[in-house]
């Protein structure tokens, strides 16, 4: 009974002092915004190779440009007037799978970029990589008093604008044990009532599905894994399948979920792991898929039920039954998606397996009656994500069904409704226009930066060391009256999220009565971050500012201290520090004397060959001294690429070593001093080290000014030359002739 609230949170940091270095980024344009243009796409998501069609609505200056970004990287800039006809145009994204992009409409002048509007694009061949889950729960035209098909069109257009790529159909079915109502001749009954006696029109269920498919969304039907109505025996449900409980007098009775007396029935529970019950539901699902074009099954449960028994009065392990039920449903329809609700985490270990598309948790507060740990704090959400991530072997993202304004829902409302209760069809709260706009901004942000937000597992998290002048800063988990940071490593970048808890002591994600005050916006914050990598670019983005557009920032890096000015922090601002992408050769073997090349000023960078992930250098190595390869993107961590063997020795007979990036800090050596050609191929995962011909080393003519670089010089004989003047010397594998 659910809808998505997504957070991804992690933990680790080692800081080693880098050599003294000062780095300033290039000048970046000032970014402002006048968000007067609404942008739309024709689909919620795209498979690689599909063309995106855009529509822009609003007053667009003739000088406007369209920019397509992957993170901060600009893929393409076009003049809007040249590409758009009637404010409509197309774009073919790169062919890479599972990528998010941000498309910006803007003007520029005098060093200022003015953002007019933005929209995200998701290119993913399977929705389960980056799920954005919505729901529908009303399938009635109320005796023709509403134009339901028009409502479907507008509702799905809004979900499309949010890039929702999967939609759950709540309480669409007839009976839980007979979801499809058929006439005597096997045809569909066009109208029926659900368990709460609401009318359901088959026409509208099918129209929702067709409209969603046109937008590239998945349509997922909801049902319990073990529910049946009263008198289900008339439909073939056997008493031997019943899930039993025992009262205080030792009497057994069938477990049930009680519902209001005005409803059609209570829900009577079956043993989910019973093979005959599973086969019964497989047959019912054949009727579902045979009559409706659903893409999968949202499986529900009811959380912890206490001690339960089967019809033979043997104890039943419900979580094991859930896992068995999932496997049976997948075996029967392997092409269909499966998602199962882990209510308050109950049964997570058995539910989170290879047969579900992603993890789905209905979360509550303390004392919710479903068992499990407290889950009403932001920190609890991270714990759930980390648990799901670990149990799924880092394969599955997490979707939350989180009822934020649960008690405020008693006050009523109308219009497009929020998910406030576990009974999805209830519509007590309407979304304000302000909230609708904010959701567009946040879903654009979630989609455009999905590779930075959800592109790596919780293993990538670390605790960042951050200070903000004049403010209290705490690393995750949240603490009262503080700016809270959460950090993770993504590729060659460190990503630090700034979360504004500075004017609240309430650290719960639940705002039961909708009374929590907004955070106080902070501007132009002086920030210092300790970083263990050499930063090449710094940029920020926020769903609260400039519709999520990238702002590149100037910064200074002195040693391991990175300083910059954060433009603003309202709720959430993401800071991305792009690290230098380089493979280095380090160790005692690359220095004739001293302590070995273990900092960036002394290490030898390998040159990246054109195309692929191949790095090469020719360098003088001292025999029987250790060297290793390290990734400049994570210099401070200082773990090398490693081979199958510790202290592996390259010689004339063995020149290859398998390459990985995990495990111990392996080092290598060569048997004799001399020049060596070194190649690291990160595609084939191989290291090649072989003797080089010194006279074949590339020659470069230079003047003495070339000596200002800090890398060491050597004579052709391999001796260290601290101050070369005239003659031929070797540096970084290149022969240099000084005149």
List each model region and its residues.
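Aromatic-lined carbohydrate-binding/catalytic grooves of carbohydrate-active enzymes
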Residues: 155-203, 227-246, 258-277, 304-312
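Active-site neighborhood of glycoside hydrolase catalytic domains
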Residues: 273-356, 368, 375-379
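An acidic-aromatic substrate-binding cleft motif
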Residues: 116-175
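C-terminal beta-strand-rich structural cap/linker in extracellular carbohydrate-active enzymes
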Residues: 558-580, 676-686
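Carbohydrate-binding surface patches
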Residues: 472-533, 570-573
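Aromatic-rich carbohydrate-binding modules that target alpha-glucans
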Residues: 580-623, 632-659
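Active-site-adjacent "subsite" loops/lids of carbohydrate-active enzymes
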Residues: 126-131, 137-148, 221, 225-292
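Residue-level detector of functionally pivotal "anchor" positions at catalytic/ligand-binding pockets or at interdomain
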Residues: 693-717
């Amino acid at each position: 009974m659910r809808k998505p609230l997504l957070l991804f949170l992690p933990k680790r940091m080692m800081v080693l002092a880098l050599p003294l270095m000062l780095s300033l980024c290039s000048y970046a344009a000032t970014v402002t915004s006048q968000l007067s243009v609404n942008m739309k796409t024709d689909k919620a998501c795209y498979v690689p190779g599909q063309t995106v069609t855009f529509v822009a609505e609003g007053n667009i200056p003739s000088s406007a440009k369209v920019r397509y970004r992957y993170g901060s990287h600009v893929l393409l800039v076009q003049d809007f007037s040249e590409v758009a006809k009637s404010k409509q145009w197309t774009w073919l994204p790169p062919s890479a799978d599972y990528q998010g992009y941000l498309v910006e409409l803007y003007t520029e002048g005098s060093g200022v970029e003015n953002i007019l509007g933005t929209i995200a694009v998701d290119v993913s061949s399977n929705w389960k990589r980056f799920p954005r889950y919505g729901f529908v729960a009303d399938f009635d035209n109320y005796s023709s008093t509403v134009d339901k098909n028009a409502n479907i069109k507008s509702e799905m257009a809004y979900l499309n604008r949010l890039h929702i790529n999967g939609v759950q159909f709540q309480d669409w079915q007839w009976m839980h044990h007979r979801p499809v109502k058929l006439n005597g001749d096997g045809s569909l009954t066009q109208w029926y009532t659900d368990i709460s006696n609401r009318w359901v029109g088959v026409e509208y269920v099918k129209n929702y599905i067709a409209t969603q498919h046109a937008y590239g969304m998945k349509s997922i039907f909801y049902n319990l894994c073990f529910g049946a109505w009263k008198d289900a025996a008339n439909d073939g449900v056997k008493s031997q399948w019943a899930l039993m409980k025992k009262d205080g007098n030792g009497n057994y009775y069938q477990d049930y979920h009680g519902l209001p007396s005005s409803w059609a029935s209570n829900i009577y529970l079956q043993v989910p792991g019973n093979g005959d019950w599973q086969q019964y539901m497989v047959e019912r699902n054949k009727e579902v898929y045979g009559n409706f074009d659903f893409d999968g099954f949202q499986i529900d449960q009811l959380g912890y039920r206490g001690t339960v028994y089967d019809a033979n009065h043997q104890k039943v392990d419900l979580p094991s039954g859930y896992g068995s039920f999932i496997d049976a449903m997948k075996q029967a329809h392997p092409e269909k998606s499966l998602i199962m609700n882990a209510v308050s985490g109950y049964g997570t270990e058995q539910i989170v397996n290879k047969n579900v598309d992603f993890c789905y948790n209905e979360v509550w507060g303390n004392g919710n009656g479903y068992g499990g740990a407290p889950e009403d704090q932001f920190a609890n959400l991270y714990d759930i994500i980390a648990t799901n991530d670990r149990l799924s072997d880092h394969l599955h993202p997490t979707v939350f069904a989180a009822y934020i304004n649960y008690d405020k829902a008693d006050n009523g409302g109308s219009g497009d409704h929020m998910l406030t209760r576990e009974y999805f069809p209830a519509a007590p709260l309407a979304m304000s226009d302000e909230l609708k706009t904010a959701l567009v901004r946040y879903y654009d942000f979630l989609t455009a930066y999905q590779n930075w937000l959800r592109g790596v597992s919780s293993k990538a998290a670390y605790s960042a060391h951050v200070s903000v002048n004049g403010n209290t800063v705490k690393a995750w988990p949240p603490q009262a009256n503080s700016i809270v940071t959460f950090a993770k490593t993504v590729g060659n970048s460190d990503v630090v999220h700034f979360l504004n808890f500075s004017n609240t002591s309430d650290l719960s994600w639940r705002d039961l009565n909708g009374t929590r005050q907004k955070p106080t916006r902070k501007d132009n914050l002086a920030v210092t971050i300790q970083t263990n990598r050499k930063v090449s670019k710094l940029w920020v983005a926020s769903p609260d500012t400039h519709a999520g557009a990238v702002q590149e920032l100037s910064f200074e890096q002195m040693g391991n201290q990175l300083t910059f000015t954060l433009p603003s922090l309202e709720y959430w601002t993401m800071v991305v520090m792009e690290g230098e992408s380089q493979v280095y050769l380090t160790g005692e073997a690359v220095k004739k004397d001293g302590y070995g090349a273990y900092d960036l000023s002394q290490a030898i960078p390998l040159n990246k060959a054109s195309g692929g992930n191949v790095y090469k250098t020719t360098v003088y190595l001292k025999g029987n001294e250790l060297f290793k390869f390290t990734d400049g993107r994570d210099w401070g961590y200082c773990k090398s690429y490693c081979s199958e063997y510790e202290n592996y020795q390259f010689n004339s007979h063995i020149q290859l070593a398998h390459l990985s990036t995990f495990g111990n800090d392996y080092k290598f050596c060569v048997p004799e001093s001399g020049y060596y050609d070194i190649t690291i191929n990160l595609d084939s995962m191989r290291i090649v080290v072989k003797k080089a011909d010194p006279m074949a080393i590339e020659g470069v003519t230079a003047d003495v000014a070339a000596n200002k670089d800090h890398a060491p010089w050597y004579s052709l004989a391999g001796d260290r030359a601290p101050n070369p003047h005239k003659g031929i010397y070797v540096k970084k594998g290149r022969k240099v002739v000084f005149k």
